[in-house]
Amino acid sequence: MDKTKKRRIQILAASVFWLGVWQAAAAAIGQEVFLVSPVQAIGTLVELLPQAEFWQRIGFSAGRILLGFGLGVLSSAILAVAAEKWEWVDALLAPVMQLVKATPVASFIILALVWVSGSSLSVLISFLMVLPVLYSAVRTGIGSADRQLLEMAQVFRLPLGRRLRAVWLPAVLPAFQQGCSVALGICWKSGVAAEVIGLPDGSIGDALYRAKITLSTGELFAWTFVIILLSAVFEKLFLALLDKAVAAVLGEEGAEK
């Protein structure tokens, strides 16, 4: 049995074990308002699936959270390159990035409500949470570039496009990929947290809050499943697309052929 298959079996067995613990705990408590069983939670999710409102909420939240992520990706790359090129930019951004990393998400959400509407809150919060993670990742990648290759590129006066492909991208992309894996999870958690506090109509966060105040524990767990699933699916899709982009940019596909 290969390692990958063995690992999948281990993960499946662990998942079954913890679902069994959850089921046993729900049966022992015997109060659905405190803890529903996994069967009940999945049943509630199945009831939500045919509803148009369910999919509208997913589209509303996913669109805004992913917009924040995209803005974070673009901004972090530009700022990281600028910080590596100019010391004054590095000095200017260092305290800002440290402040964003150190400040609790809830504090940002409450402060941001003063400046933006509830419907735009998840965009801003997702952006802020992603920015320092990817900024650090890109800086790390730039710092790991082979200096000898850079000197050779300068001596032979390679054009910028060739330098990017031969030196900078091979150094930056692995760190960027790892940073994206972390940032995607953070942006989903922080984005939904922003919606729970900002309560924009038609969002997943609004649905979570309504389930909480009506003591609909099954619906609360169902929406939590949805958030976890969305985060995992978008992470897998984005990283798969990024892998293909990396292969295309670095010429790996051509080499394999």
What do the predicted segments below correspond to?
Residues 2, 28-70:
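Periplasmic/extracellular loop-to-transmembrane helix junction in inner-membrane transport proteins
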Residues 5-29:
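N-terminal signal-anchor transmembrane alpha helix
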Residues 67-97:
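Transmembrane-helix boundary motif in ABC transporter permease subunits
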Residues 87, 178, 222-257:
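C-terminal transmembrane helix and the adjacent membrane-cytosol boundary/short C-terminal tail
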Residues 98-133, 140:
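Generic hydrophobic transmembrane alpha-helix motif, especially the helices
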Residues 124, 128, 161-193, 222:
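Transmembrane alpha-helices
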Residues 137-176, 208:
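Short cytoplasmic-facing helical segments at TM-TM junctions of multi-pass membrane proteins
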Residues 179-229:
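Non-cytoplasmic
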